[in-house]
C-alpha cells in the first residue's frame, strides 16, 4: 500500500523546487514547500486510481 502522505509531501517539495524556490525557506512562518501541499494533493489523488489499476 503506498504511503499517500509521503507521496504528497514529495510532490509538494518537487513542485517547490521546479518553481525555483528552496524547499525549506520560510514563507508565512512555514517551510515554503508546504504552500504547495494543496496542488500536490490534487495531483497525487488524480494519479492514484491509475496506479492501483494493476
Task: Give the residues covered by each predicted segment.
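Amphipathic alpha-helical segments that form the core helices of the histone-fold
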Residues: 26-48
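Amphipathic alpha-helical oligomerization segments
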Residues: 2-25, 46-54
